[in-house]
Amino acid sequence: MTNIRKSHPLIKIVNSSFIDLPTPSSISSWWNFGSLLGICLALQILTGLFLAMHYTSDTSTAFNSVAHICRDVNYGWMLRYLHANGASMFFICLYLHVGRGLYYGSYMFKETWNMGVILLFAVMATAFMGYVLPWGQMSFWGATVITNLLSAIPYIGTDLVEWIWGGFSVDKATLTRFFAFHFLLPFIIAALVMVHLLFLHETGSNNPTGIPSDMDMIPFHPYHTIKDILGLFMMILALLSLVLFTPDLLGDPDNYSPANPLNTPPHIKPEWYFLFAYAILRSIPNKLGGVLALILSILILIIIPLLHTSKQRSMIFRPLSQCSFWLLTADLLALTWIGGQPVEHPYIIIGQLASILYFLIIIVIMPLAGLMENHLLKW
């Protein structure tokens, strides 16, 4: 008799995706982040669902409803901090996942890579709208500043901003629609994840060497499931440590003050995971130029497969490319730091230099390093 997991119409899809999936035997722990991201998404949807049961998306009650969740709802504080810090874990895993793709040349699977970039945009949009919901000072002013950037679009900009706001300023209509979209988008993200996996399973996984591994495959279960569970435990340990010991470590103290349109905080900044893009935005004096640089800082990932010049796929045997990769990593950390600093003398110039370097590394230095390594191979 045929095993039910291989014959049942539904179970066989799960079987071919997560159990009998042929996987390269050499993939390292850097390949764990896909499964961790799936778990992060599930955690965010679950905690978000329970939070939505108690939250009210009205400007007069939103802030108090969040306080009510923390004080009066059973384990409401834990739900709230799991959701807020779960978003941070989500972005840590996302950035490591993208970094792994860059380092090992996984971007050569163009459909999977492009789907991943779309997913990154969707997650960023969801996180931004979620940050507005507690209706604290930073929520309100963050929403005002970021949505206002669209007014830089020629001709239709102002109308577009007022259309998004649902009025002449960030108000009740804005909060209600942001809550609606924040609730809806994770389910769209879950559907996009299915497409991402569909494209991935068309080609099979890449591996650290970057060479085809068709002759050396092992089943996903039990080998990689065990490895993924280790990563899961480590992530849960980190998340629970954050939630139970320092839940506000990554938040902004200003968000504990109710939103006040008449009082601007001294330094408006987004959550830490957007600071690198925010620093790039601020480093350009022109509004439209800043908005374009902000969008391009993420959209540039789309053209990375076109900028691949090396004969080798992975960076594992390419020292020059490795140097440029770690320079990019350091540059992103510098941008993240700058994004959190006030706009004054040393920080402005550091931010501008780091922004130029960011685009320079991706567009010029990395392709040149690949070409140089090709020549070195001939020696």
Swiss-Prot record:
Heme b b566 binds at H97, H196. It is found in: Mitochondrion inner membrane. InterPro entries: Cyt_b/b6_C, Cyt_b/b6_C_sf, Cyt_b/b6_N, Cytb/b6-like_sf, Cytochrome_b, Cytochrome_b_C_euk/bac, Cytochrome_b_N_euk/bac, Di-haem_cyt_TM. Heme b b562 binds at H83, H182. Heme 1 (or BL or b562) is low-potential and absorbs at about 562 nm, and heme 2 (or BH or b566) is high-potential and absorbs at about 566 nm. Pfam families: Cytochrom_B_C (PF00032), Cytochrome_B (PF00033). The chain crosses the membrane at residues 33-53, 77-98, 113-133, 178-198, 226-246, 288-308, 320-340, 347-367. One of its GO terms (molecular function) is metal ion binding. Belongs to the cytochrome b family. A ubiquinone binds at H201. Changing S16N: In strain: Isolate MR-M981. GO terms for biological process: mitochondrial electron transport, ubiquinol to cytochrome c. Binds 2 heme b groups non-covalently. One of its GO terms (cellular component) is mitochondrial inner membrane. This is Cytochrome b. It is a multi-pass membrane protein. It comes from Laephotis capensis. Its cofactor is heme b. The cytochrome bc1 complex contains 11 subunits: 3 respiratory subunits (MT-CYB, CYC1 and UQCRFS1), 2 core proteins (UQCRC1 and UQCRC2) and 6 low-molecular weight proteins (UQCRH/QCR6, UQCRB/QCR7, UQCRQ/QCR8, UQCR10/QCR9, UQCR11/QCR10 and a cleavage product of UQCRFS1). This cytochrome bc1 complex then forms a dimer. Its main location: mitochondrion.
